[in-house]
């Protein structure tokens, strides 16, 4: 599971380049191929020239920023492969946009590059702003701190933690928190979340479910299972 981010343009030594140093930057909104949790993942662009030192700097930049934001005690995964490398790390589920931008900055900085001043495609940015990788490292880290504080939703985290303590599923996207499943679920807009004591916990619970994964045949399999259950 993941959600793509718009990619900033690249600038190196004052020159605008035609490509970015990565080909995919994602928010990981749940369990994924790296770890069982939320976070961010970045894949280097095919053919990008980098060495072991750049890879170490990339990870070190991520660790530095995570420590600054208090995310130190979480997983970081680095994978090298034939065409490049990927780096993924766990992050608070309510701060995944800043996590993705942090990962992008960490790679830019590791390569000695900067993003252009093209505004980030962020509906919440008021006014539109450049990517943090447009600035020097100290300013980038300062901006990441501010962005994390703006994105954080402590009341959302508290509700999800309360649901987990009670063994009730809770799922949040960019707009809504739902607690429970199926007919035994209730949803709230993120800008109108209830107090923990106002949630009707006794009415909310999980339901039996089947998960279908794979690259081909998922829809057909789900339709087949649904038909079998209806006929049962």
List the predicted regions and their residue ranges.
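N-terminal accessory interaction module
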Residues: 45-123, 144-147
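Long, low-complexity repeat tracts used as extracellular stalks/passenger repeats
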Residues: 87, 132-134
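Metal- or metallocofactor-binding catalytic centers and their adjacent structured scaffolds
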Residues: 125-128
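A short, surface-exposed helix-loop junction/capping segment
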Residues: 135-150
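Short Lys/Arg-enriched alpha/beta "domain-start" segment
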Residues: 1-71
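Phosphate-binding loop of NTP-binding sites
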Residues: 177-183, 190, 194-232
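N-terminal donor/sugar-recognition subdomains of glycan-related enzymes
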Residues: 151-152, 191
């Amino acid at each position: 599971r993941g959600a793509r981010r718009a990619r900033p343009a690249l600038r190196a030594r004052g020159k605008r380049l035609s490509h970015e140093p990565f080909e995919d930057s994602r928010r990981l909104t749940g369990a994924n191929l790296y770890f069982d949790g939320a976070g961010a993942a970045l894949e280097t662009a095919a053919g990008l020239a980098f060495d072991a030192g750049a890879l170490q700097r990339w990870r070190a930049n991520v660790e530095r920023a995570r420590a600054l934001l208090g995310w130190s005690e979480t997983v970081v995964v680095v994978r090298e492969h034939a065409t490049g490398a990927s780096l993924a790390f766990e992050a608070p589920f309510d701060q995944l946009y800043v996590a993705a931008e942090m990962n992008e900055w960490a790679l830019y900085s590791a390569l000695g590059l900067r993003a252009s001043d093209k505004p980030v495609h962020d509906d919440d940015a008021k006014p539109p702003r450049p990517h943090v990788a447009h600035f020097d490292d100290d300013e980038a880290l300062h901006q990441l701190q501010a962005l994390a504080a703006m994105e954080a939703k402590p009341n959302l985290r508290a509700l999800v933690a309360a649901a987990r303590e009670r063994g009730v599923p809770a799922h949040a996207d960019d707009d809504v928190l739902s607690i429970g499943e199926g007919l035994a679920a209730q949803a709230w807009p993120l800008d109108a979340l209830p107090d923990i004591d106002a949630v009707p916990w006794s009415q909310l619970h999980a339901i039996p479910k089947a998960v279908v994964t794979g690259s081909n045949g998922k829809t057909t399999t789900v339709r087949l299972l649904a038909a079998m259950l209806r006929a049962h």
